[in-house]
């Protein structure tokens, strides 16, 4: 995977966790969308794309270049990368050098939603498959 090679070249330790996406996706939703009712989640199609919480303005976040800048500045020791269509999760350690431009969402000529979240789930960066949506950055202690 091109993403893994790029990260390793930056000195980031990458471990591929098999079949962990659904578990991490659930944790992401429980952390960042816990204030939404089931009905609200249904209305914004959260089950389809977690990033709808941002595009439907359900929580305030940084967008576009401000999101990239915030992601580049946030402390990154350990974090996860997970994708919309891939069951595996990448665990990154020693990720201090990870930057927004290092996130690849073009996988085999198919644009993917890419979610990056720190291992404590205190912030998230989302690079969507839609050119006109995102990227988004949200940190829990921002509010």
Question: Could you tell me what each predicted segment is?
Answer:
Residues 1-133, 137-143:
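Structured alpha/beta or helical-core interaction and ligand-binding surfaces enriched in interleaved
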């Amino acid at each position: 995977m091109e993403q893994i090679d790029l990260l390793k070249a930056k000195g980031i330790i990458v471990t591929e966790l098999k079949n962990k996406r659904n578990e991490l996706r659930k944790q992401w939703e429980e952390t960042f969308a816990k204030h939404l009712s089931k009905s609200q989640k249904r209305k914004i199609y959260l089950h389809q794309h977690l990033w709808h919480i941002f595009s439907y303005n359900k929580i305030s976040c940084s967008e576009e270049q401000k999101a990239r800048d915030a992601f580049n500045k946030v402390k990154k020791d350990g974090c996860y990368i997970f994708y919309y269509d891939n069951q595996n999760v990448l665990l990154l350690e020693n990720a201090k050098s990870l930057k927004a431009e290092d996130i690849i969402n073009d996988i085999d000529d198919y644009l993917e939603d890419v979610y990056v979240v720190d291992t404590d789930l205190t912030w998230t960066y989302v690079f969507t498959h839609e050119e006109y949506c995102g990227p988004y950055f949200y940190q829990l202690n921002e509010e």
